[in-house]
């Protein structure tokens, strides 16, 4: 597989009396560590279907091969007659996304609704699934994904309309409504990975790089605490004229273009070692994770340009605000925001978060409505990524970041710094911190 560059830190946050959380850096998380219980991940982005376009948008779907790398069977029931006491709600759902890196900014530009799993084929592939383990046929057959077994949903399946709304799924626990609500569809992009033509047109995106991503959410995987490695990504290209998406090939032999057990935000530091990537975990019965990537560039001797991308991995509580606070009342300017709009009948607002940089405070913030005022506000929900940027007359060593959570609970917010690069690394010499992750 492709080596991931840069160091990844995990922050475990403990609620303080004021409702905020604080934390410290712990050891980097290593891919492929042994897990207890069922553990589903995407071992291969299998294929991509391009459905054409209309009204300035194109529709796509991503094929995914899943694998149970854990030590127990994964539930895969979506009928009322499953054995083992399983209910029809105990099956995975599959989300698909598209991301772009353009001119130093990492953004999500496409998202799908959800494919509900209906049948596990339980194929064996020791090379691409659980190395050294053959597929163990599960007791309930196709109603489970066995240990070391794979199952492929090609793009045509994952893009087969109708799909299920994301709004009906709690990604932290994998509790969801089933049968899902069928709202109907009329366009080729409805419920699929919907992307604006302007975001993929090669003529308008010179030098841009693209990645597709697949993520599974499953009930007994989440209950076992294994829901943080369920996404994988793969580089893609866009064909001029047709805007068809194409996968990066598995070439040379032994090289796997799909990067396993990491969400697509990891592609940014893999491409650019000046990017810092930080895990922010919200404590609870099941950990809820945000991944925060940051790149700071010295514009001149007194001004720095800041680029942030925040990815919600599995947090049902979601986020409603993000702020960066500097120690001094530094001037802040040129603040901006990019999100990914819900579509095809989801109930959520698509109103942008407006940046606010109050003079004399040294703070810039973005926010949407509170949950109490609008439960369908444009919160940063699971499997989505929002981007933020600004200029400041202050180095990154003085920046303190805060994510305010959307749904009620404790803590109400998480506050963190980037300790690994707290000296700013104005020289951009990050060689000492660049390493392959196993």
Regions found by a protein language model. Give the residues of each.
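Short beta-strand elements of extracellular/lumenal beta-sandwich folds
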Residues: 294, 298-316
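Extracellular adhesion/glycan-binding regions together with long Ser/Thr-
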Residues: 176-181, 345-385
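Low-complexity, acidic Ser/Thr/Pro/Gly-rich terminal tails and inter-domain linkers that flank the onset
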Residues: 250-301
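Solvent-exposed N-terminal domain segments of exported/luminal and surface proteins
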Residues: 36-239
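Low-complexity, intrinsically disordered segments enriched in Ser/Thr together with acidic residues
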Residues: 183-204, 367-398
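Bacterial N-terminal signal peptides
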Residues: 10-24
């Amino acid at each position: 597989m492709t080596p991931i560059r840069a160091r990844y830190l995990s922050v475990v946050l403990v609620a303080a009396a004021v409702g905020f959380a604080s934390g410290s850096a712990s050891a980097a998380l290593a891919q492929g560590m042994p897990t207890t219980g069922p553990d589903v991940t995407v071992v291969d982005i299998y294929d991509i279907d391009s459905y054409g376009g209309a009204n300035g948008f194109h529709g796509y779907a991503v094929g995914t091969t899943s694998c149970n790398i854990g030590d127990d069977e994964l539930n895969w029931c979506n009928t009322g007659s499953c054995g083992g006491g399983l209910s029809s709600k105990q099956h995975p759902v599959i989300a698909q996304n598209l991301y772009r890196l353009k001119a130093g900014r990492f953004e999500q530009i496409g998202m799908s609704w959800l494919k509900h799993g209906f049948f596990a084929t339980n194929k064996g592939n020791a090379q691409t699934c659980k190395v050294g383990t053959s597929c163990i046929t599960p007791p309930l057959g196709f109603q489970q994904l066995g240990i070391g077994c794979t199952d492929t949903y090609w793009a045509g399946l994952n893009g087969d309309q109708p799909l299920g709304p994301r709004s009906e799924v709690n990604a932290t626990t994998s509790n969801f409504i089933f049968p899902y609500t069928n709202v109907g569809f009329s366009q080729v992009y409805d419920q699929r990975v919907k992307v604006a033509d302007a975001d993929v047109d090669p003529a308008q995106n010179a030098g841009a790089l693209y990645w597709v991503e697949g993520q599974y959410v499953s009930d007994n995987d989440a209950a076992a605490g294994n829901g943080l490695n369920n996404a994988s990504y793969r580089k893609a290209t866009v064909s001029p004229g047709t805007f068809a998406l194409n996968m990066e090939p598995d070439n040379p032999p032994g090289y796997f273009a799909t990067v396993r057990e990491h969400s697509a935000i990891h592609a940014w530091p893999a491409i650019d070692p000046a990017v810092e990537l930080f895990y922010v975990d919200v404590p609870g019965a099941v950990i809820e994770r945000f991944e925060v990537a940051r790149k700071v560039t010295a514009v001149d001797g007194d001004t720095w340009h800041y680029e942030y991308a925040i990815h919600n991995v599995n947090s049902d509580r979601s986020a409603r605000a993000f702020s960066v606070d500097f120690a001094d009342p530094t001037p802040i300017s040129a603040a901006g925001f990019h999100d990914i709009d819900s579509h095809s009948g989801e109930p959520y607002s698509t109103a942008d978060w407006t940046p606010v940089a109050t003079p004399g405070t040294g703070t810039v913030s973005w926010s949407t409505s509170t949950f109490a005022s609008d439960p369908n506000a444009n919160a940063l929900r699971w499997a989505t990524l929002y981007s933020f940027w600004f200029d400041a007359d202050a180095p990154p060593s003085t920046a303190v970041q805060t994510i305010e959570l959307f749904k009620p609970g404790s803590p109400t917010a998480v506050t963190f710094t980037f300790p690994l690069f707290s000296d700013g690394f104005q020289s951009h010499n990050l060689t000492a911190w660049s390493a392959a992750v196993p």
